[in-house]
Structures are given as C-alpha cells and as structure tokens.
C-alpha cells in the first residue's frame, strides 16, 4: 500500500478527486481584523522585489486598510487579494492561501486555497470532526445561510472521496465577503461535517475555493461554480470590473488580482500579454500544448531568462489538453515526453544547472501568425525557472532537483503548476475563455530562488474528466 506522501507529494494543495456524489438527507459583528492590513504587516509579508513593485502603496492609506486593496483605479481598475505562504518544514512543503469571511454579521473567517484545478468550494462546519488539535476555523450558521435542497425536497448531502480519505457534508448558500463592501450573496458552499484526511492537520488553510468550471458532479448536484456565480450575478461587472483574475506568486507570498490586470506585476508595464484559448470540457482551465523543444543557453552580456531565439520546430508530441493549475507545485509532463525527449533532464548537483537547456513550450494561440494551420506562441523556462534549490536539513548543504516530473498515469496532458507560474503573471479570462501569460516582475537568482526543502515524490492524474490529487 502506497503511503499518503506518495500521493501527497511535493504538491502542497488538496486537489479534489470528485467521485460519486450521493444526494440524500443528512452572531456577532464582522471582525475588522480580516480586512485590516497595516503597512508594517504589508512589508513583512512580501519580499523585496514585491515591495519595489508595490512601493507606491506607502502613500495610499485609504487602500491599505482592506483585505482587497483597490489600486490604480483610473488606470488598471483592479482589486488585489493577498496570498500568504506557509512553509511546512517537517514535510518540506509549501502552500499559498488567502482570507475570506462567510455570512452576514458573523465572524466566520477562513483561510482558503484558491485552486484553478478543482470546482468545489468547501469549508468545515462547526460540528466537523476535523483535526486532533482543532486548529482550523469552522463555519457557524448565520442569518444569511440557506439550505440547498435536492429534487426530493431534502437537504442536499455530499460525499467527496480522496485517495487518502473522504469528506462528508451538505450543500448550502451564504454570503461570501472578500472585503468591506465586496459581498457575494447566495454563493454555493459545501459545508463539511466530517473530514477524514489526516494530512490536513498540517495546513493553515481551512478549505478550498475551486476556480474551475462546471463538471459532471456539479451538474448532478445543481451546484454553480464560484466563477460562474460571479459572472451570472454580475458581481464584478456591476462595479465596473471584468470577469478575469490574475495569479502572481513570489518566494514569500503573492496576490490574486481580481477584475483587471495589474501592470506592476509584469516585468515591464508595457509588455504584451500573450493569450491561449481555453477549453472547459474537463472542468479545468485547459490549454493546448502542441509540443516542446530544448535550446542551449544563449550567450549574451545581459541575459534575460526568457530571451532566446524562438523557432517553430523541435519536438512535437501532438496537441495535448493541459491544465494550468494554481494548486499544484511541480510541472508534470506526459510520461512519453519525459522518456522520449526529456530523459536527459537530470541534475546531480546545483553546479549542473548551468549545463541544462532552456525548455520552450509551444502553445496554441489566438494571435500569433499561423504556422502550418495553427497559431502558436512560445513560452520559455530557463534552468533558473525549473530547477528547485533547497537546503538539505541533514547535511545543511544546498541541493537541487528538477521541477519537471513525469505523470505516471500515462495521461498525455501537462500540468503547469507553481514552478511554472512563478515565472509568469498568469491571467484567467472567464468572459473570453482564454489564459494570458506575461513574464512577471520577480527576478529569481541562485540565492533567493527557493530556500525551503521539498520532498520529491509523485502526483497522479486520473482518467479523462477526473483529476487525482495528492490525497
């Protein structure tokens, strides 16, 4: 029997493995603390690069006092949600989470994982048997809570099965707050009454907000995914925002930009975003990776990590539906690609990093001139991008591993996790069903790239239209 950590892996998030969902029966004022972000706390929770990017916020006092910070309204018209990074030293893992509140006139404050690789939105209910130490926040019913009923008029009950446990609960509705004055009424939420997943005891986040699309399970239960709810109820557009969000992460934290694009997170404010069309049939944000190729490091006096002459040639392994996943750490490649083309992508010491090639992803695009009937863009990862540096806790030495691993389930698609997303400010456009990529502002170097240790194990993806996570 495989251990939990074989599935749990280097990946730090919970990916929902949605199986059979069964349908049968089963007051206080809002705390100001959630939406108060003092300048000192703000400084302590971002790295120096991010502080340079956000330096102009020093004089923006009216905006600092919000969990969602409204910035550059006339220019960018974007909301900013802070992501906190948690390092789990004992298991050599990391995770990013944000804060929300649930319920009118309540103190239901939660740390949540924002996950484009799942659809479910769940938090633990107050009676939930969750962890031994009872360290997680739990939901108490509010005046704005409503049950969701099935077609028999009974409360809708769910069971979600994971590889290492299960979650049981019921469906309901309540108001979700992302900041003062930014409420999302009547949001579909699953309230867990029993969670038998021991590894959750290690995480600071309490639940998951799935940012994926409708799938077979949500259709069966009559659940509207979170992003669909935002769009259908015009939560953003009525406030003159767009139905898009961006994902920007650094070595110490990050931000979700909601409703617009924050140009300060680009490497250059004027740098163009390149877009790839999204397909939704799998329930995830999937794009077509047409192939990849390797290039030797270019010789130049002032090298930029993605500055390489692109060529529309190289190794093409066919059009693969691939997931852009904010809940996965590594990049997972099709097994045949690792075996047939990237089999020499190995490293014995950190010094070997200089010998590694640039990896160029050839991705279907809407905009670039057509090549053999396909519109193609190329995104580049340097060895600095995909090699993970860490400190060996036993020997206190710097070690390196490759952040691109094989998907052992023989699934043809890729999973672009946070190793990839750390290099690109990534925009998820709900209205136009496209994902935008632009090199981010963060400069990664040998000393600051990653100082945490990570456990090198594997994650599995299941058959089409389902997704296996680390549990």
UniProtKB/Swiss-Prot annotation:
Disruption phenotype: Normal blood stage development in the mouse host. In the mosquito, development of oocysts, and sporozoite gliding motility and invasion of salivary glands are normal. Residues 96-438 form the Peptidase A1 domain. Keywords: Aspartyl protease, Cytoplasm, Hydrolase, Protease, Signal, Zymogen. It comes from the Eukaryota. Residues 1-24 form the signal peptide. It is an enzyme of class 3 (hydrolase). It is found in: Cytoplasm. The active site is at 115, 325. Its EC number is 3.4.23.-. One of its GO terms (biological process) is proteolysis. GO terms for molecular function: aspartic-type endopeptidase activity. GO terms for cellular component: cytoplasm. InterPro entries: Aspartic_peptidase_A1 (IPR001461), Pepsin-like_dom (IPR034164), PEPTIDASE_A1 (IPR033121), Peptidase_aspartic_dom_sf (IPR021109). It holds the Pfam family Asp. Belongs to the peptidase A1 family. This is Plasmepsin VII. It comes from Plasmodium berghei (strain Anka). The lineage of its organism: Eukaryota, Sar, Alveolata, Apicomplexa, Aconoidasida.
């Amino acid at each position: 029997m495989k251990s939990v950590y074989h599935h749990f892996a280097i990946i730090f998030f919970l990916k929902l493995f949605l199986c059979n969902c069964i349908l049968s029966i089963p007051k206080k004022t809002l705390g100001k603390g959630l939406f108060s972000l003092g300048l000192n706390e703000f400084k302590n929770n971002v790295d120096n690069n991010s502080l340079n990017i956000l330096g102009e916020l020093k004089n923006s006092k009216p905006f600092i006092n919000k969990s969602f910070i409204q910035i550059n309204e006339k220019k960018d018209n974007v909301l900013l949600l802070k992501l906190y990074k948690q390092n789990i030293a004992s298991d050599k893992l990391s995770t990013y989470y944000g804060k929300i509140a649930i319920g009118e006139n309540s103190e239901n404050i939660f740390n949540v994982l924002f996950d484009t690789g799942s659809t479910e939105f769940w938090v633990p209910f107050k009676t939930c048997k969750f962890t031994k130490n009872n360290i997680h926040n739990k939901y108490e019913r509010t005046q704005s809570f409503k049950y969701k009923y099935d077609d028999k008029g009974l409360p809708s009950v769910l069971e979600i099965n994971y590889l290492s446990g299960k979650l049981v609960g019921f469906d309901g509705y309540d108001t979700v707050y992302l900041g003062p004055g930014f409420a999302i009424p009547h949001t579909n939420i699953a309230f867990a009454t029993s969670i038998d997943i021991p590894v959750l005891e290690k995480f600071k986040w309490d639940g998951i907000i799935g940012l994926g699309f409708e799938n077979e399970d949500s259709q069966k239960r009559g659940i509207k995914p979170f992003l669909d709810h935002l769009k259908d109820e015009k939560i953003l557009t009525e406030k003159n925002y767009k139905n898009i969000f961006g994902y920007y992460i650094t070595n110490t934290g990050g931000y979700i930009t909601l409703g617009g694009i924050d140009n300060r997170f680009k490497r250059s404010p004027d740098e163009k975003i390149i877009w790839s069309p999204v397909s939704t049939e799998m329930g995830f944000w999937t794009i077509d990776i047409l192939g990849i190729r390797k290039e030797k490091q270019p010789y130049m006096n002032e090298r930029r990590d993605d500055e390489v002459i692109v060529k529309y040639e190289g190794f093409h392994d066919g059009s693969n539906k691939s997931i852009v996943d904010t809940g996965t750490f590594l990049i997972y490649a099709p097994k045949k690609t690792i075996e047939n083309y990237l089999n020499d992508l190995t490293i014995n010491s950190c010094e070997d990093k200089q010998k590694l090639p640039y990896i160029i992803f050839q991705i279907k695009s809407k905009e670039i001139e057509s090549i053999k009937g396909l519109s193609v863009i190329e995104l580049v990862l340097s060895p600095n991008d995909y090699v993970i540096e860490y400190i060996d806790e036993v020997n206190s030495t710097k070690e390196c591993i490759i952040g691109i691993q094989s998907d052992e389930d023989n699934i043809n698609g890729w999973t672009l996790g946070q190793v990839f997303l750390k290099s690109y400010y990534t925009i998820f456009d709900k209205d136009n069903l496209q994902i935008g990529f632009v090199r981010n502002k963060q400069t990664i170097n040998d000393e600051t790239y990653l100082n945490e240790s990570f456990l090198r194990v594997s994650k599995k993806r299941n058959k089409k239209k389902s997704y296996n996570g680390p549990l």
